[in-house]
Amino acid sequence: MPEEAETFAFQAEIAQLMSLIINTFYSNKEIFLRELISNASDALDKIRYESLTDPSKLDSGKELYIKLIPNKTAGTLTIIDTGIGMTKSDLVNNLGTIAKSGTKAFMEALQAGADISMIGQFGVGFYSAYLIADRVTVTSKNNDDEQYVWESSAGGSFTVKADNSEPLGRGTKIVLYIKEDQTDYLEESKIKEIVNKHSQFIGYPIKLLVEKEREKEVSDDEADDEKKDDEAKKDMDTDEPKIEDVGEDEDADKKDKDGKKKKTIKEKYTEDEELNKTKPIWTRNPDDISQEEYGEFYKSLTNDWEDHLCVKHFSVEGQLEFRALLFIPRRTPFDLFENQKKRNNIKLYVRRVFIMDNCEDLIPEYLNFIKGVVDSEDLPLNISREMLQQNKVLKVIRKNLVKKTMELIEELTEDKENYKKFYEQFSKNLKLGVHEDSNNRAKLADFLRFHTSASGDDFCSLSDYVSRMKENQKHVYFITGESKDQVSNSAFVERVKARGFEVVYMTEPIDEYVIQHLKEYKGKQLVSVTKEGLELPEDEAEKKKREEDKAKFEGLCKLMKSILDSKVEKVVVSNRLVDSPCCIVTSQFGWSANMERIMKAQALRDTATMGYMAGKKQLEINPDHPIVEALRQKADADKNDKAVKDLVILLFETSLLSSGFSLDSPQVHASRIYRMIKLGLGIDEDEPMTTEDAHSGGDAPGLVEDTEDASHMEEVD
């Protein structure tokens, strides 16, 4: 008695995705075949890999292939592979109840106008079958389980049951019941066209069951018998030859040895035709391969719907032999920096035999956007993942891949337009490389691009910056911050720009990590204009003026330090300000204001490190600013004047904000500003507040008159 089918509901996101696929019009439905062939190829890769360590895995079927069977009579297209197959739990989980991470991301991309052909990149390619089929059955046999069949007409549920029909041995058979308006996908010519376009570089034979004709000589009696048999079978789907009378031979009197007349008839028969006889592209001479061929191979390898940006095809010979084909895609994948995501961008082959596609030791993490193939002559076929980690050959391959990738990016820099596209997508990867890869740091630094105070809207390289440096300029000056507008208007760049020195604007959070490791470039030290100890080239007159200013404002600096106490490490006369009265700088080895902001946003930040790294601040005052000069005169007249204390605190808090820091008590600072606005508008301090104000108890600290308020201001950071 046959086992009853179990019914399962599709996971909500998968049901949504299927509904989207079925109910939306897509013009390029043909990608369904690419996706199903790609999945079949993956299944074949898995069984071949398992068989390297356990050859008995192939006892259930030695031949590894993909077969396509169109049946116009039944209206079905069948895709068979002799891959690893699926167990019952695989069928339930992989085809419906567990959504992959890409399901939601793909739906969002689709709704945002992305192409349906992107589906394979998100790991949900199987569901593209419903572009052309209204019902799908998947029969599968894994070595570790019985044969089961999965079936769904996409109505929100699917069934799985044991299958006692024709045994597969091992592998998967997908039957697509083609929609009435999609029957052109049953035509041989259409299938050949799609396979040639999308899947010609699959590493296993793709066989298509085709119908052919041949002429055959038979006697009249045999012809009559075969004709009758053929008529009897004409409605049945069969591989038996079909007979068609093509008239008698030219020699009507020609007879066989029994004296019977002979006829030539046309016989129809079916046979497998291999569609992808092209040998692996990476084994061919690069000079013989067109850009179109590289493009087709890239798409079949990655399921990308766009062409690659550039390609590097090379071979290494000598003590170690391997061939490789490396591609840079046009855009970043949606999950590029997901830590838990297994990378499968570079497929590792040994002597044309696929070994694995998620070998983490093949290329460093910061280059995880590179896609391609590596085919080694020296690795053992049955190498395990554990053995790979210790393998010296792999380390040499990795070193060569990194070197060739650097060459590829360097070649790309010569094409400004394409490099701009590349940099917009992958600049974070290059910067991560500067942070992580000390051996290639100098080379990666050449690839970085930034806005500067002299570059306008264009990006420029550090090499361009160095070539424009003034004769008396010793350092590369830079500033980090949130945006180009913010840093270009910062108080820190005033004097540097006024002196004609160019400043590099670093406005991405990752730049803070880059400069921790990129201390110099081409012998020029990188100097932050927001850190203490900024030295600008100066002549004797400027030196003399600076010494005079130091002496003149020494008393004010000491007074300000005593008022601000532990809030600052010291107060000094600045050599970097022009228009601003003061600014807050950090110590050489502490965090900049921008880094402090980034670290405060970290959910898992270390508060002990925060206190240590963010603790040291220095207040710099501008000796040429009228506010500072007036404050000095007021302090010299009476250093105990409460107004001086109030103004010092107000200046300090305002400079914290303008220097990119945040206030611990913004409300107290705001209250002081409101009090100043009141004074500016001539509103009497003693004027009674409205009822709401009285209830809120919103008593703001005074600025000048109220002694108690003034001392309160002194205590608040």
Swiss-Prot record:
Mind telling me which InterPro entries this protein's record contains? HATPase_C_sf (IPR036890), Heat_shock_protein_90_CS (IPR019805), HSP90_C (IPR037196), Hsp90_fam (IPR001404), Hsp90_N (IPR020575), Ribosomal_Su5_D2-typ_SF (IPR020568)
- Residues annotated to bind ATP: N39, D81, K100, F126, R385
Q: Which SUPFAM superfamilies match?
A: ATPase domain of HSP90 chaperone/DNA topoisomerase II/histidine kinase, HSP90 C-terminal domain, Ribosomal protein S5 domain 2-like
User: What highest taxon heads this organism's lineage?
Assistant: Eukaryota
- Motif annotated as TPR repeat-binding, chain positions: 713-717
Recall the GO molecular function terms of this protein's record: ATP binding; ATP hydrolysis activity; ATP-dependent protein folding chaperone; unfolded protein binding
Q: Where in the cell is it found?
A: Cytoplasm
Quick check: keyword Nucleotide-binding in the entry?
yes
Note one Pfam family from the annotation: HATPase_c_3
| Comp. bias (Basic and acidic residues) | 225-245
Ranges in a coiled coil? none
GO CC terms of this entry: cytoplasm
What keywords appear on the UniProt entry?
ATP-binding, Chaperone, Cytoplasm, Nucleotide-binding, Stress response
Q: Which SMART domains match?
A: HATPase_c
Just give the chief location class.
cytoplasm
Name the segments for region: Disordered: 213-263, 687-717
Please explain the role this protein plays, according to its UniProt record.
Molecular chaperone that promotes the maturation, structural maintenance and proper regulation of specific target proteins involved for instance in cell cycle control and signal transduction. Undergoes a functional cycle that is linked to its ATPase activity. This cycle probably induces conformational changes in the client proteins, thereby causing their activation. Interacts dynamically with various co-chaperones that modulate its substrate recognition, ATPase cycle and chaperone function. Required for piRNA biogenesis by facilitating loading of piRNAs into PIWI proteins.
Assembly and binders: Homodimer. Interacts with shu.
Per its UniProt record, what HAMAP family does this chain match? Answer: HSP90 (MF_00505)
The family assignment reads: Belongs to the heat shock protein 90 family.
Notes concerning its domains: The TPR repeat-binding motif mediates interaction with TPR repeat-containing proteins.
Which NCBIfam families would you find in this protein's record?
PRK05218.1
Q: Write the protein's name.
A: Heat shock protein 83
What does the record give as the organism's lineage?
Answer: Eukaryota, Metazoa, Ecdysozoa, Arthropoda, Hexapoda
